[in-house]
Amino acid sequence: MSTSLLARRKHLMALGALAAGSVLRASGAAAERAQARVASIGWTAADVLLSLGVTPVAAAEKYNVNVLSVDPRQQLPDNCIELGLTNQPNLELLHALRPDLIVVDSRHLAIENQLQAIAPVFRLNIYGDPGGLPLERACDQVLKLANALDITVRAQRYVASVDASLQDQRKIVDSLGGTPRVLAVQLFMDGRHLNVYGKNSMLDDVMVRLNVQNAWQGATPPGHVPTLGIEELDSMPDTLLLYMSDERYAPIALHNLASSEIWRRLPLVRHGHLAPIPRLYPFGGLNTALQFGRELTDALVRYRKIA
């Protein structure tokens, strides 16, 4: 993407005002909107709110949201009330909290009608229908949500900072004089399978932005993640494998992979063309793009030094 994300979105602010409206405007004065009590249903919803400096008064699956964040500033605090599971939140508790707005992931819409009976609902649609271009859609959705919360200037600065960071990473990658194809994966604990992130994913969009070729070019429906057997990596000998490393699953997966003859014989394994990256949420918002851009660039710099 050669042009600035922020520049491409100047016209979207006007559209966002019409399409999303100011959901809270009916509640009263601007001061009230600025102090809106917001609840989040879905990990992406919580991630996007936190990225805008908005701490939800209540959120579903707080533990999972915090586990997926490596930045303490992007974690839900203790005084954020737990609402339970994303697909079965505690509606009675949510009603008692009387939020001004409920932000919900587009992948958790089964209860949207019930939520609308409690408070206005903002549907965050980064990975839902029609799918595709999650990086671009995340910028759009952040600005529309910010418009609803009357924090437009803050959101514009945030989007601009993400854009600037990706531009900086692109310059570093370009200076390397060529990079390998990259495969971003989540290892399975069974030591036989892995998830790959191809087109229609935030990780692929970041690769495109940094001019890095994704080794996985297979079909990837929006919002889905293909699963491969490790034997399929045999056809990717010149690929740099980036696996998400977390303290819960990665050690078990690596232990089981170490005992696999198939794994040990893979060219990319024999040549040491694999590297861990800190845990991240692949279906997050711009924070995911920001984090993966940095991790991808760092991994490519290290690869170039030892290649």
What is each residue range found by the language model?
Residues 37-52, 153-210:
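Basic- and aromatic-lined ligand-binding clefts that recognize polyanionic substrates
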Residues 37, 43-97:
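A short, structured surface patch at a secondary-structure boundary
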Residues 5, 25-40, 44:
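C-terminal segment of N-terminal export signals and the immediately downstream linker at the start
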Residues 110, 124-144, 177-204, 249-252:
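Extracytoplasmic ligand-binding site segments that recognize negatively charged/polar headgroups
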Residues 36-37, 140, 240-307:
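Structured C-terminal subdomain patch of bacterial secreted/periplasmic proteins
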